[in-house]
Amino acid sequence: MRRRLFSMMLVLSLFCLSARAEIDLSTQSPQPTSTPAPVELSGTALLDAPPMALDCAAALLLEPESGQIIFEMNADSPRAVASVTKVMTILLTLEAIDDGRVALDDVVTISESAAGMGGSQVLLDVGETQTVDVLLKSMIVGSANDAAVALAEVLYGSEELCVDRMNERAQQLGMAGTHFVNCTGLPADGQHTTARDVARMSAAMFSHPLYYEYAHIWLDEVDHGDGRVTQLTNTNRLIRLYDGCDGGKTGSTDEAGYCIAATAQRGDMRLIAIVLGAPSGAERFDIAGEMFDYGFANYRLYPVAERGTRVRGGLPVEGGSQGSVAVQLDADLTLLILKGSEQGIQLSPNLPESLAAPVAAGDRVGSVDVVVDGKTVASIPVAAAEDVDATGLPYALRRILSRWPAIGG
């Protein structure tokens, strides 16, 4: 009976939470301290199939704060994605700037290899000098292949070494279906990725504030210093066509079709739309816009729990210096839910009747399951909020023996 009453009190107290926060359910290999943790995508999409007809080869709609996929189509099918490949090149550049390995005002001398790139370019000449700032802008706004290679060379010494790092970073982000061969997305045997993997690296790129200082630019120009000026026009038409769109990377080749990884924000919710293999440039923008419309119209972020929130009543402690210990939520949680479905969220505690002393602050003592429509969608760990020492002769003897100097030599 005592446990039942305690469980009811816990559920009532947890429903009083209102602070908005984000849970980190991801793991990654060691990274520089400024590198954001990868977004951990949910294993199952909220919808079994897209809610509208999508005239493209693959698609995915993601809410990156929760990591929740709203819907997907052929998300794990390997494909060429053309210049959407540059998402990884941009990401590595942003991370290098954050880590202090390069600065925006660093001057780069353009190599023959960079100047000789085909496809979309900003028309750099061999021996020309440009700043990292100009090259990054040219890649984000104009999808310039020559700028991408120039940055790859300044970051890693050569495009080949940059590609090695691209593949390494892809593995760290959990991009199991991806292999890079170049840093531009120009056609190359063996180069492929998936809509799910594009979502992973795009979420990482979109997490950098510096990215948005370039992504919103519609028209600009590059001064080459010899009298030539190259006009830049943003390849992502959605920044002009869709309310809330503030970033994205396009790409197209005969093999890849027309692709885009775009993001839009309305209120406190950001969405990422991945469209691969659309039949035309206009249709990829239309499809992404439809996907955004559905997500913003039907879903919202709901703050469920905040790390450090005390669970009322605490837990009894047997053999302790005090009779109970305060316990608290040990993670934050925000869920993506259908608008109006808040009442369907239930919190179910999984806590022991009591704890045995000693108890240290931070010790995990149980969890609280988050249940939506009868399904457990997340589990929030619960930890001790304070230390409780043990009392009694057996414990005292163990402490004395543990501190006794070793005998012998």
Sequence positions of predicted segments:
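Surface-exposed charge patches
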Residues: L12, E168, A262
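Bacterial Sec-dependent signal peptides at the C-terminal "C-region" and cleavage site
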Residues: L17-I23, A383
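General helical structural elements
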Residues: F6-M8, T253
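Positively charged n-region of N-terminal signal peptides that target proteins for export
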Residues: M1-R4
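Hydrophobic alpha-helical membrane context
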Residues: F15-C16, D98, M291
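Bacterial N-terminal signal peptides
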Residues: M8-C16
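Active-site-adjacent loops and short helices of periplasmic peptidoglycan-processing enzymes
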Residues: E22-R196, R200-P209
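Domain-terminus/edge residues, biased toward the C-terminal soluble/receptor-binding domains
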Residues: M175-H179, P187-G409
